[in-house]
Design a protein with these regions (language model features):
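Conserved alpha-helical positions within TPR/SEL1-like repeat arrays
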Residues: 14, 18, 45-56, 67, ...
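Helix N-cap motif at beta-to-alpha junctions
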Residues: 326-327, 368-375
Length: 504
């Protein structure tokens, strides 16, 4: 009789526990499930609910212990294996999470969430072909699942199969017309395919559906650096960009660019942003002027960081580095590099130095394909700086990325004589080929050249430069009268750099 009483009481508690979990009362669910597992340590369901409650309450490590206990008590519970996979995924233990999701699918082949999460895991592990298979299996099970088509599209894009990726996003949108993420992913893919007009249509739809989505506003500002929309596209980002460009053209002058000119241009631009109440920021610190060549710098740096080798491309890459001394000089240099006429329209940028291992603060860079070209451009830049900025700046020619000489000191040697010039190690070729097989995306992008003229993206970046200038204590920064710090992260990093690289 006593046993039946206890059993009846436990069933009542379990029903209450399930209700607490289903209604989102996780603190109470945690408390009750702890009580049950203490009194009934082999109650598998109580351990499973305890794990879910602990996870929701931010106790991820304790949650892991509880779900492992649940799996141990009932190894054939597919849901317990799935929950264990989710927790391991959150803990970034991806290999173990993969095993759990595969076990879930083995126990329950139509467990759609497990196929989806397995796809995510495989994508992160860069096993893209396997990720594709997982998403395709999910679509077999749920052909009308818009998220599955979107996720497959992301994987196909990373595989460099842009047309198939586009088809997946369009299918997702047909199933869920107001699917913001799919519209945005489609826009990004269309930009990479060079179809800017169509990309603009999708960004317009994203902003219509979610007007204040930060990343989409940033994406659109980036698109407008190389695309002029027709009159049918009218939203605050487009309007602000147009007004900034018009003001720049009005203020454009020949000869020395005065401090007052820079201050006026910046203040006019920020006033336009305020006029349209545009809440937009960027974390970028680099303002580019791009031609149609894909330098693939992100790829090269990943190869260097992962394998400690210098990619072959970088042995023929040189740059002219210009070093302004104040924030005002940096903005002036941006204008000079915007207006400069070069035979190859070389890629160039202005930036603030954020890399902890690299010295310096303000920089302008012009990328060149050989040493002779670099020296010619360096001489030309010296003349332009004198004529348009009126101050002397340090101008040097360097080879490749600044990180390379730290690992390979001989790489920084620059001379026309082949005797001392470090050469590419042919043993590295196979490593690069293997990497590119696994990472086919970046080299297939179509790069659209940047339009001339100051734009919204430039102003957002200049705001970040000002935060940086405050961090390093640049005395000229107060002239720009930016009271708000838009990027606390950039400001803090700049303060840290000041102590390390303060000019001697």
């Amino acid at each position: 009789m006593e046993k039946r009483n206890v059993y009846f009481l436990t069933e009542q508690k379990i029903n209450t526990l399930l209700e607490l979990h289903q209604t989102g009362r996780y603190v109470e669910a945690e408390k009750l499930s702890l009580s049950i597992t203490k009194n009934f340590p082999k109650h598998q369901l109580a351990w499973k609910v305890l794990a879910l409650a602990l996870k929701q309450n931010g106790k991820i490590s304790e949650s892991l212990i509880a779900i492992q206990k649940s799996v141990q008590l009932e190894p054939r519970d597919s849901n317990a294996h799935y929950n264990l996979g989710v927790i391991l995924q959150e803990l970034r233990r991806l290999d173990e999470a993969e095993v759990c999701f595969r076990q879930t699918i083995k126990l329950k082949p139509d467990y759609t969430e497990a196929h989806n999460n397995l796809g995510f895991i495989l994508q992160e592990l860069r096993r893209l072909d396997e990720a594709e298979n997982s998403y395709r299996k999910l679509i077999e099970l749920k052909p009308n699942n818009a998220e599955a088509h979107n996720n497959l599209g992301v994987t196909l894009k990373e595989l460099g199969r842009f047309e198939e990726s586009e088809a997946c996003y369009r299918k997702a949108i047909s199933l869920k017309p107001n699917y913001v993420e799919a519209h945005r992913n489609l826009a990004i893919t269309l930009v990479d395919m060079g179809r800017l007009e169509e990309a603009m249509s999708n960004y317009t739809k994203v902003i219509e559906l979610k007007p204040h989505l930060p990343q989409s506003l940033q994406d659109l500002a980036g698109l407008l650096t190389s695309y002029v929309p027709h009159e049918g596209f009218s939203n605050p980002v487009v309007k602000v960009n147009e007004e900034i460009k018009k003001n720049y053209l009005k203020e454009k002058t020949i000869g020395i660019i005065s401090d007052n000119k820079i201050i006026k241009l910046f203040n006019q631009s920020t006033s336009v942003i305020k006029k349209y109440n545009l809440k937009i920021e960027t974390q970028s610190c680099q303002a580019f002027r791009q031609n149609s060549i894909n330098l693939n710098c992100e790829r090269h740096m990943k190869v260097f960081n992962e394998f400690n080798i210098i990619p072959k491309f970088c042995f023929g890459c040189y740059k002219v580095q210009v070093e302004p001394t104040t924030i005002l000089e940096l903005i002036k240099l941006l204008i000079v590099l915007d207006q400069i006429k070069l035979i190859k329209n070389n890629i160039r940028k202005c930036m603030v130095e954020m890399r902890p291992e690299i010295s310096g603060f303000y920089k302008g860079l012009i990328y060149c394909s050989n040493l002779e070209e670099a020296y010619q451009i360096a001489n030309y830049i010296e003349i332009l700086v004198k004529e348009n900025i009126g101050s002397k700046m340090n101008i040097i020619v360097k080879r490749g990325c600044s990180e390379y000489p730290i690992a390979f000191p001989d790489y920084k040697e620059i001379n026309s004589s082949e005797s001392k010039l470090m050469k590419y190690n042919e043993k590295w070729k196979l490593i690069e080929e293997d990497y590119d097989l696994l990472n086919p995306l970046k080299s297939k992008r179509i790069i659209t050249p940047t339009l001339t003229g100051l734009n919204l993206q430039d102003i957002l970046i200049i705001r970040n430069w000002i935060d940086y200038a405050k961090g390093i204590g640049d005395p000229s920064v107060h002239l720009l009268k930016q009271n708000t710090i838009f990027s606390q992260k950039i400001y803090n990093k700049a303060k840290t750099r000041l102590g390390k690289y303060k000019e001697r």
